[in-house]
A protein has these predicted regions:
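A conserved beta-strand-loop-helix scaffold within acyl/acetyltransferase catalytic domains
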Residues: 11-36, 40-159
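Active-site/acyl-donor-binding loops of N-acyltransferases
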Residues: 19-44, 48, 129, 179-245
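Aromatic-residue detector
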Residues: 96, 105, 125, 134, ...
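Intrinsically disordered, low-complexity, positively biased terminal segments
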Residues: 1-20, 97, 101, 231-245
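Residue-identity detector for threonine
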Residues: 7, 53, 75, 125, ...
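Acyl-donor binding region in acyl/amide transferases
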Residues: 1-30, 143-200
Length: 245
């Protein structure tokens, strides 16, 4: 067999149609990826949204342009992305988390890896005001798919909904490029479903070469077991909430 020293493989987030059959595996619910299947045209996408959402997009875009006439939307491909732009958007995200009293989810190493990934296969979308980045999306490209990793805006412009508008414009840009799917990724936020995202269950997977190899990785087994328990409890809460409504 190839790679005989490899006894275990862990995948933290995957969409599985069926369990792998060749090797023993353990699975646990991970989260949901909100996926938007992109139509052939911007008009078709807008028509698929609710009338309220379409009006909300028009209202906030016109209001932002009226308040900030220099506002413009731009995209940058991997080779033209500047680290200062990436740090600005990540900084906006950090400020938002801190303002909410929540822990920022990326340490310095996470940020370095994300910046390296952006330079390799990323697309940066920004809204600028007077030539300064005030909102942005950090996305990666894979085939016909585009995935959003970070969305953030300058807290000084909270009232203009720049993050939401930048996301809308990025979806429209993806349609113009001929992309097939837009992945909002995990985390339930109202705007993802308003813009057409549908939840797709993601699974955490531990794949073993043989059952006996499970004994070599007790920590991985414990972590996955706890993840499965959390997923089960979450599904119970969701069913209870649905029953109340």
């Amino acid at each position: 067999e190839r790679y005989p020293s490899l006894t275990v493989m862990q995948v933290n987030a995957a969409s599985l149609r069926r369990r792998p059959m060749r090797h023993p595996c353990l699975v646990a619910p991970r989260s949901d990826d909100y996926v938007l299947d992109l139509p052939d045209s911007e008009d078709a996408w807008l028509a698929s949204l609710s009338a309220q959402t379409r009006e909300k997009i028009r209202y906030h875009w016109r209001r932002a342009q009226r308040r900030q006439p220099s506002l413009r939307f731009r995209t940058f491909a991997a080779a033209s992305i500047d680290d200062a732009q990436l740090r600005a958007v990540i900084g906006f995200n950090r400020a938002r988390m801190q303002a909410k009293g929540r822990r920022f989810g990326m340490d310095d190493e996470d940020q370095r890896r994300l910046c390296a990934l952006m330079r390799e296969r990323g697309q940066l979308s920004v809204i600028e005001i007077d030539g300064v980045v005030r909102a942005g999306l950090l996305c990666t490209l894979a085939g016909d798919d585009i995935a959003m990793h970070v969305i953030a805006h300058d807290p000084a412009f909270d009232d203009l909904r720049l993050g939401f508008l930048c996301c809308v414009m990025t979806v429209q840009d993806a349609i113009a490029q001929g992309r097939q799917r837009f992945h909002f990724l995990w985390g339930h936020y109202d705007y993802k479903t308003r813009l057409g995202g549908k939840p797709v269950a993601l699974t955490q997977l531990l794949l073993l070469r043989a059952r006996r190899h499970a004994l070599r990785h007790p920590w991985r087994l414990t972590t996955l077991g706890l993840a499965a328990l959390r997923g089960w409890l979450r599904s119970l809460r969701q069913r209870a909430g649905a029953a109340r409504h």
